[in-house]
Amino acid sequence: MDKTFLAYQVEKKRDTFLGKVLERSISDLPKGNLTVKVFYSSLNYKDALSACGAKGVTRNYPHTPGIDAVGEVVDCLDNSFEYGDKVIITGYDLGMDTAGGFGQYIRVPSSWAVPLPAGLSMYESCLLYTSPSPRDDR
């Protein structure tokens, strides 16, 4: 039997975007060689845009937002990480058109992940991440 998990998923119904928590199957996750059990994900501006249907952020619905995630490796097909390693994934396409950190599990290319730095908790890592605002270049 396939393992299931919970995810916040946004669906498009006509011109309206609705979010709800659904049970999903691990086999529904996208292709990738790294599967991570998510412990934390932060909520930021891009997540709000994705949940509201902003085409510049997410083009394909239904979709799970969450542009960053921190958690433990449960499977790595290329051996770049071991079971139980703590990793951070942020940026790339996570939470945009690749199912993101608002699910209890994600699957991504292993090149998207970095090891959690020593001395930093998983919780702290999501508190520290902030995406640059458009005004940061002044």
Stretch-by-stretch model annotation:
Residues D47-A48:
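Cytochrome P450 core scaffold surrounding the K-helix E-X-X-R motif
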Residues S25-L43, A54-L94, G100:
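Glycine-rich beta-strand-centered segment in the early N-terminal region that forms part
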Residues L120-L127:
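Short pre-catalytic strand/loop immediately N-terminal to key active-site residues, enriched for Gly-Thr
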Residues V21, V70-E72, K86, Y105-R107, ...:
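Conserved hydrophobic/aromatic beta-strand scaffold that supports enzyme active sites
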Residues Y129-R138:
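Single conserved hydrophobic/aromatic residue that forms the stacking wall/gate
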Residues G95-S110:
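A structural motif shared across PLP-dependent enzymes of the aminotransferase-like
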Residues T16-V21, A54-K55:
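Short gly/ser/thr-rich secondary-structure transition/capping motifs
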Residues D2-Y8:
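Short structural boundary motif marking the start of a folded domain
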